[in-house]
Amino acid sequence: PEALGHERIHQLEATAVANAEQALSTDGPEEQRFFLVGYTPTQFWLDHYPLTTLLGHTGQHLEAAVVATFLPSEVVDSLYAVMQKAGLEVASMTLEPIAALNAAIPADLRLLNLALVDIGAGTSDIAVCRDGSVVGYTMATVAGDEITEALMRACLVDFPTAEAMKLELGRSKSVSFTDILGLEQTLPAEELFSLLDGPIQALADEIAQRICQVNGGPPSAVFLAGGGSKLP
């Protein structure tokens, strides 16, 4: 028999994705449309034996498992509309944690049980890999904005000022700002960090909980990306 090539493997993956799409359309509301925005093969089987890749192998019975992500059509349409207004065309689309993990964690390191967390402004996107494959994605709805809002309340400043203070915290021993009363103040970075202990701990706890949920327990290591990851 002929050895398995890229085309046959892609066909197998496409079948798995099509099955996922069929299951989603069957279980979801009839009026809701979803679009595939990314998928990652998590495991292959050749004649019922698990493999990380089928390329170059021969066998009779092939199976593939994938993690496929679908977004509501309204979200995808909005993204395309923004690109069109900017005079650009969409060549491909993927999820932030997929892109971040592919960029930050080499394929040979994905044999380890690792998690990558991209802490942005509004959400913290999480991807988990083990045994050579990406095995799951999830998202925590807490991120850098929670820290900014905590600074607003603690120091009586507006959002842009709090955002600038947050950025300065990682670079300086003291932070100067003007509060909403027009008073100029300078506080030691350590004092500001003490004010943020609660929100930072809550952010860390939520992310840790999400990682353990999608991974089934603590991973061997966690990689951090995004601006929010610069917080201590």
Segments predicted by a language model, with ranges:
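A general structural motif
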Residues: 199-208
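Short glycine-rich, Thr/Ser-proximal phosphate-binding strand/loop in the N-terminal lobe
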Residues: 1-3, 133-151, 155
